[in-house]
């Protein structure tokens, strides 16, 4: 197992780790702990090269009225009603060394990316008695890459999703289920960063290719979460389906699907005595 750079712990855990949701209930204002995370993911969506990471990480949760720091995201709440929430969402990708990826041999490395932008979240269906909820999320994010000496804007991403949450899926089990699904769209700049092959990098087995903007595939994610105090156990599987994506014919796309899976154990050893309502 390889850890390419120390920052990747934060990048993966805050932006890539698929969300596992908890039902609305009272929670401590903040929690502090540590954990261990096992992740397998492709170099990029469509790559046939996969990496495994085993990472320790700090566990920190803050549930403020405006700023929320959760296991799955950092968000700033701009506007909220009973059914509608406007906040800030993020995402990201890990760096790729082209020398370690046969399909990118001789090309420039892929720097890590991060995405940030507003997200409109609309509750379509909610049943507090049976503990389930259906939400439509509509995030629009600007994507940036960085080599830690400069930051470059790479493009825009729109990733609408339907999110279903169910607490205690088997009565008395304490296991929460989350399922999300939806298409992804991105502009030419974003697709070009991952899938374009400029003429100087073309080879007999890797033709030149110019990526366009549009449909970027669809994603299905399933996650499970269980609290066994003072531990929190989470697992997820996420699959990207790339059939019909505008970059499908890129010579850098070797798989028409991409699978990412992870498992984490968090130990919460310190928390606030002040309780607040936990809202997703």
Q: For each of these PLM feature ranges, what is it?
A:
Residues 151-232, 240-245:
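Outer-membrane beta-barrel transmembrane domain signature
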Residues 30, 50-56, 82, 110-116, ...:
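Residues that define the transmembrane beta-barrel architecture of outer-membrane proteins
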Residues 23-30, 45-46, 65-85, 125-134, ...:
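Short loop/turn motifs that connect adjacent beta-strands in outer-membrane beta-barrel proteins
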Residues 220-280:
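Predominantly the C-terminal beta-signal and adjacent terminal strand-loop region
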Residues 44-49, 75, 105-111, 127-129, ...:
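Outer-membrane beta-barrel domain signature
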Residues 36-40, 58-62, 73-78, 116-124, ...:
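Residues on the lipid-exposed face of transmembrane beta-strands in outer-membrane beta-barrel proteins
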Residues 46-50, 99-104, 147-154, 189-198, ...:
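Outer-membrane beta-barrel translocator domains and adjoining extracellular loop/strand segments
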Residues 39-45, 93-99, 123-127, 141-149, ...:
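Sequence/structural signature of outer-membrane beta-barrel proteins
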């Amino acid at each position: 197992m390889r850890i390419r750079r120390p920052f990747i712990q934060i990048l993966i855990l805050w932006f890539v780790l698929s969300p596992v949701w908890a039902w609305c209930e009272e929670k401590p204002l903040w929690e502090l702990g540590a954990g261990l995370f096992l992740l397998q993911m492709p170099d990029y969506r469509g790559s046939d090269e996969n990496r495994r990471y085993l990472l320790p990480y700090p566990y920190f949760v803050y549930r403020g009225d405006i700023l929320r720091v959760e296991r799955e995201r950092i968000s700033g709440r701009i506007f909220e009603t009973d059914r509608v929430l406007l906040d800030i969402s993020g995402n990201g990708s890990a760096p790729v060394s082209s020398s370690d990826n046969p399909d990118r041999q001789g090309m420039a490395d892929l720097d890590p990316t991060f995405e940030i932008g507003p997200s409109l979240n609309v509750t379509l269906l909610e049943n507090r008695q049976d503990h389930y909820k259906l939400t439509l999320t509509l995030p629009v994010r600007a994507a940036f890459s960085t080599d830690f000496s400069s930051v470059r804007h790479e493009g825009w991403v729109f990733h609408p999703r339907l999110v279903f949450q169910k607490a205690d899926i088997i009565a008395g089990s304490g296991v929460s289920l989350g399922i999300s699904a939806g298409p992804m769209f991105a502009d030419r700049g974003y697709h070009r960063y991952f899938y374009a092959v400029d003429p100087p990098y073309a080879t007999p087995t890797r033709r030149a290719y110019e990526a366009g903007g549009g449909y970027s595939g669809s994603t299905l994610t399933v996650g499970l979460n269980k609290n066994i105090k003072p531990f929190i156990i989470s697992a997820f599987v996420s699959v990207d389906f790339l059939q019909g994506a505008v970059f499908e014919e890129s010579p850098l796309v070797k798989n028409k699907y991409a699978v990412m899976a992870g498992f984490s154990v968090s130990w919460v050893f310190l928390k606030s005595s002040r309780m607040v309502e936990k809202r997703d």
